[in-house]
Amino acid sequence: MTTSITLGMIGCGNIGSEFVDVLDERRAAIAATSGIDLRLTRIGVADLGKSRSPAVGSRVLTDDVGEVIDDDEIDIVVELAGDVDGVRDIVLRTLRSGKSVVTGNKALIALSGPELFAQARESGVDLLFEAATVAGVPILRPLRESLVGEEVTSIAGILNGTTNYVLS
């Protein structure tokens, strides 16, 4: 049995367009493997006139992010806007609306993480940010779920590409 999850997205620049392309290419495989059919239906953008990937064309684009947040059909909002100041408020509003948020925004988590996680807990939803860590390598979920019987006391190393670049 397949469960359908409807996604909304905030931001559709280079990374957002790639996300749409990969989702379209891998949607059937994801459904076959996980039993979850991911449908992206609405995308909030800053500039409706900007050129985007052809795959984006079948979605409803809006320059009013409230239309994404307030859409009752949307289960999860993917934040790929890349900004921090305006995005913080958007993510807070989304969490307050009872929707989980997935973000790859390192700066957002670094600057507003405690506030956002508190709001997610209060609203009973998830704020997922694994794409913002260790160059997107899935490490947080294995630490939290696969090693639940182990006591991980520390992780040492340079854990992101940005730091590697700055230090080299």
Predicted feature locations:
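Conserved hydrophobic residues forming the short capping helix/wall of the S-adenosyl-L-methionine
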Residues: 27-31, 120, 147
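Short conserved micro-motifs on helix faces and helix-strand junctions that flank
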Residues: 10, 95, 102, 157-158
